Every structure is written in structure tokens, then in C-alpha cells.
Amino acid sequence: MSQKAIKGYINLIIPAGGATPAPPIGPALGQRKVNIKTFCDEFNNSTKDTEKGVPLPTLITVYEDSSFSFKIKTPPASYFLKKYARITKGSSATKKEAVVGKVTMDDCREIAKLKMPDLNTKDIEAATKIICGSAASIGLEVVGN
């Protein structure tokens, strides 16, 4: 069986159950002659069990015959961190200038377990450090050991 020729890739962050032909999805798919309604229906169907509105990074592979496939990844670390810290927005200031909330090391470890498939490590301690770095970058203080 021969593989289809790949025309290109599209990276989008789409809310779960919220794929619509409106920007940014419609224009990105339309430029590559992909059937937008079909994509939206398939995406919304595959995310129907996920909490509505959760941002999902999605890699769409577009083939030469205008067909497509897509892979949905885990939500961004910042989404989980904000949820655990019970805040709606990260800090607009850099580093330690403005701490907007706190998360525990156990929270970071829990998030790392959820994010493991999308991180570039198989070691839970390294993954936890990655998540702690993300926490610092959005103005969260990591407490505990």
C-alpha cells in the first residue's frame, strides 16, 4: 500500500467541541482546499467527550488529494497550571516581578504525568522540571519540594 503524498501541515489550537469554519480554522484549511465542514464535524465528534472549550493543540496533515488526517495533543501546560492555581490569566510581567498564584510541586508532577505523551522526555522528574519552568514563565510560584 503506497502512502499519500503530503501537501503540508497545519498547527492550530482549537477549543474542544468548538471547531467552526470561522477564523482561524476556515482560512487555514481553505487555502489548502480541505473540506472545512468535514474537518469541523470530525474534530467536534472526536472531542465530544472532552470538556467544552479546553484548548487542544492539533496537527492537521493535508494530502495532495485534499484529504486530511489530524492528531489532537494534550492541552498546553499553561492551561493545566492556571486551572490548578485557580487563576484565569498568567502574569504579564516577566519572571519573579509579579507572582499571580501558587502551585505545589505535587501539582506540577501531576500535570507532568498528563503531558508526558507530548513532552520530549520519558523521565517524570525531567518532565516535572519542564512544567515548573512553564509555571515560572506565567508568574506562578512553585511551593513544596
Curated annotation (Swiss-Prot):
One or more lysine residues are methylated. Keywords: Methylation, Ribonucleoprotein, Ribosomal protein, RNA-binding, rRNA-binding. It holds the Pfam family Ribosomal_L11. The keyword RNA-binding applies. GO terms for biological process: translation. InterPro entries: Ribosomal_uL11, Ribosomal_uL11_bac-typ, Ribosomal_uL11_C, Ribosomal_uL11_C_sf, Ribosomal_uL11_CS, Ribosomal_uL11_N, Ribosomal_uL11_N_sf. Signal peptide: none annotated. Belongs to the universal ribosomal protein uL11 family. NCBIfam families: L11_bact (TIGR01632). Forms part of the ribosomal stalk which helps the ribosome interact with GTP-bound translation factors. Part of the ribosomal stalk of the 50S ribosomal subunit. Interacts with L10 and the large rRNA to form the base of the stalk. L10 forms an elongated spine to which L12 dimers bind in a sequential fashion forming a multimeric L10(L12)X complex. This is Large ribosomal subunit protein uL11. It comes from Rickettsia felis (strain ATCC VR-1525 / URRWXCal2). The lineage of its organism: Bacteria, Pseudomonadati, Pseudomonadota, Alphaproteobacteria, Rickettsiales.
